């Protein structure tokens, strides 16, 4: 299918001013750049994509927009039109090329299915954008897929500075997927190399020559050899797979044009593509997870204020309450957590955590808090900290509220949660399955550190649930009314130990018999999601790691001194975390990498 000829003026907004020239300035003007925007069914990511383009630190008078959209079944066209109407006058030139019909390709099985006709049409569009940039006299053209979010506002300047003919900013994703290949076979297929992971993980930093970049990359239109580059038609000798990214890689190779990827900076994010049989909802869920990852790892994504977005409809997912324990003096954590819940459309309620730094012996005596005789941290040998007392009291207050209000089931989050992909959908499905099996339960871990996962048995009829063994952390769990009653009935305040040590005692899985002897009955029915649905945002040793329980005063020390116990095994990134789909946990390349 050939790209359609230029549309009538009513369909094509072509605001072509003369190429900006320097006028009375001491320094030469910045190079001119065309931003090529090709959007299809991008409603879920366009607001953040366009917001990132708006924030690029680059004069609008030196930028042109080339925008095309086609074959949409969502609101992509209206979003782009709204955005161009709001910001288009700020740019040196704007090309607007929408196609309302058809809404799909004849042979496609769904909107994420790549047919030969779709590949060809995309190549023709990219070629049209490239031709426009050359005719307009631009110095560069930036291709950036609409689910690639350039959170670094210096991206254009940083890519232009080294003077490379074709260069990509290395983008991060939810997995090890990125926008470059380190190896390619003689037949044009992906080849694994020893360089990929050190590059992707930034164990080696710089700008490196690679055989292919895709999704987001900058092409210098002044560099030697780039005048021969083309997306369509393919090179006369081309025999590799019919795919736009491979066609362009071959064109670079044939023209002798070096291709580089740069990873010294964090430039932004790209969404892991869904499989061909999946739909737009799967892609939307993936992108929400990418937003959440950016909130943790930074910098965050910001949506354009010039685009109307579908309204959010937060819910409690069928629970009576969704509690978020958060210290008032950690507003950044609270804001991140509430933003994460909002993005997932989860309605949460903040519970101000008890601040261990505000506790003293007098307050704890008034509350009836006393140390469990003989308690020591299992790894550092230290005693209970005031931070751990505050943490326990925070959870305890929620258990009390559950019983007082008669809440049938609740979710409890701490404010350092990293959510796994499709957290909301997977939790809702898990609870539906638990209800269908009529499983009696008191507590279900959603995130924890397993000590002996090989000893945990899958619950019959519930493949995503295991009987919980000895575990650390209380960052995310589901609690029933019956479970809250059991926890309170054990009167734990007068024989306190960390809350994540207390819970395994209550379901009789703690290895310390002396500790267990202080509590009876130990009949809490505890389970865990498998794979886990949440993990900590950071671990001991990470640059952003911070703990108000590990960096604290001993429980009976009123001097105010803070001691950091950072070597506890509990806070380290352990190999026994049962995670799936999270950042850095999947080593399998995406199918498109195996072309």
UniProtKB/Swiss-Prot annotation:
GO cellular component: endoplasmic reticulum lumen
Pfam families documented for this protein: Glyco_transf_25 (PF01755)
Signal peptide stretch: 1-24
Gene Ontology biological process: cell adhesion
Major location (coarse): endoplasmic reticulum
Region described as Disordered: 576-595
Glycosylation sites: 75, 153, 237, 360
InterPro entries: Collagen_mod_GT25 (IPR050757), Glyco_trans_25 (IPR002654), Nucleotide-diphossugar_trans (IPR029044)
Endoplasmic reticulum listed as a keyword: yes
Subcellular location: Endoplasmic reticulum lumen
Keyword annotations from UniProtKB, A to Z: Cell adhesion, Endoplasmic reticulum, Glycoprotein, Signal
GO molecular function, one term: identical protein binding
Chain positions of motif Prevents secretion from ER: 592-595
Family that this chain belongs to: Belongs to the glycosyltransferase 25 family.
Function text: Probable cell adhesion protein involved in leukocyte transmigration across the blood-brain barrier. Does not express any beta-galactosyltransferase activity in vitro.
Protein name (database record): Probable inactive glycosyltransferase 25 family member 3
Native species: Bos taurus (Bovine)
């Amino acid at each position: 299918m050939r790209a359609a000829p230029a549309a009538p003026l009513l369909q094509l907004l072509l605001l072509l001013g003369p190429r900006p020239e320097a006028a009375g300035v001491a320094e030469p003007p910045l190079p001119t750049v065309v931003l090529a925007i090709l959007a299809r069914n991008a409603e879920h990511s366009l607001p953040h994509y366009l917001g990132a383009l708006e924030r690029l630190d680059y004069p609008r008078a030196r930028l042109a927009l080339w925008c095309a959209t086609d074959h949409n079944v969502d609101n992509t066209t209206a979003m782009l039109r709204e955005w161009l109407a709001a910001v288009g006058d700020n740019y040196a030139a704007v090309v607007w090329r929408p196609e309302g019909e058809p809404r799909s390709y004849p042979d496609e099985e769904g909107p994420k299915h790549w047919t030969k006709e779709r590949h060809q049409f995309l190549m023709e569009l990219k070629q049209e954008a490239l031709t426009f940039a050359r005719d307009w006299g631009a110095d560069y053209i930036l291709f950036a897929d609409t689910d690639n979010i350039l959170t670094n506002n210096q991206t254009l300047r940083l890519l232009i500075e080294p003077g490379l003919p074709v260069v990509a900013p290395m983008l991060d994703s939810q997995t090890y997927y990125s926008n470059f290949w380190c190896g390619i076979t003689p037949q044009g297929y992906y080849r694994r190399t020893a360089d990929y992971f050190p590059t992707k993980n930034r164990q080696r930093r710089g700008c490196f020559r690679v055989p292919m970049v895709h999704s987001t990359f900058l092409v210098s239109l002044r560099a030697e050899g780039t005048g021969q580059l083309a997306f369509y038609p393919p090179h006369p000798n081309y025999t590799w797979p019919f795919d736009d990214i491979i066609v362009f890689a071959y064109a670079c190779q044939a023209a002798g044009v070096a291709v580089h990827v740069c990873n010294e900076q964090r430039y932004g994010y790209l969404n892991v593509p869904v499989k061909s049989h999946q739909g737009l909802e799967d892609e939307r869920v993936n992108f929400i997870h990418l937003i959440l990852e950016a909130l943790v790892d930074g910098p965050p994504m910001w949506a354009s204020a010039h685009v109307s977005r579908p309204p959010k409809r937060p819910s409690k997912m069928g629970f009576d309450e969704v509690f978020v324990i958060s210290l008032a003096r950690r507003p950044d954590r609270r804001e991140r957590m509430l933003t994460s819940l909002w993005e997932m459309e989860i309605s949460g309620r903040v519970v101000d955590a008890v601040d261990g730094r505000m506790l003293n012996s007098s307050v704890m005596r008034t509350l009836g808090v006393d140390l469990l005789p003989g308690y020591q941290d299992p790894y550092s040998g230290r005693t209970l900290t005031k931070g751990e007392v505050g943490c326990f009291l925070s959870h305890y207050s929620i258990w009390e509220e559950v019983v007082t209000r008669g809440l049938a089931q609740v979710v409890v989050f701490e404010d350092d949660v990293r959510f796994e992909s499709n957290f909301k959908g997977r939790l809702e499905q898990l609870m539906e399955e638990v209800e269908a099996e009529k499983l009696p339960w008191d507590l279900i871990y959603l995130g924890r550190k397993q000590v002996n996962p090989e000893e945990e048995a899958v619950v019959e009829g519930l493949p995503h649930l295991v009987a919980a063994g000895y575990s650390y952390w209380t960052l995310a769990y589901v609690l029933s009314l019956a479970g809250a009653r059991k926890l309170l009935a054990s009167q734990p305040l007068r024989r306190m130990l960390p809350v994540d040590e207390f819970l395994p005692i209550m379901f009789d899985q703690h290895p310390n018999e002396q500790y267990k002897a202080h509590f009876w009955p130990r009949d809490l029915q505890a389970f865990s999601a498998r794979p886990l649905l949440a993990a900590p945002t950071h671990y001991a040793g990470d640059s952003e790691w911070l703990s108000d329980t590990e960096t604290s005063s001993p429980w009976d020390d009123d001097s105010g001194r803070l001691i950091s116990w950072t070597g506890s095994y509990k806070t380290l990134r352990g190999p026994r975390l049962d995670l799936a789909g999270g950042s850095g946990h999947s080593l399998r390349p995406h199918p498109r990498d195996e072309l």
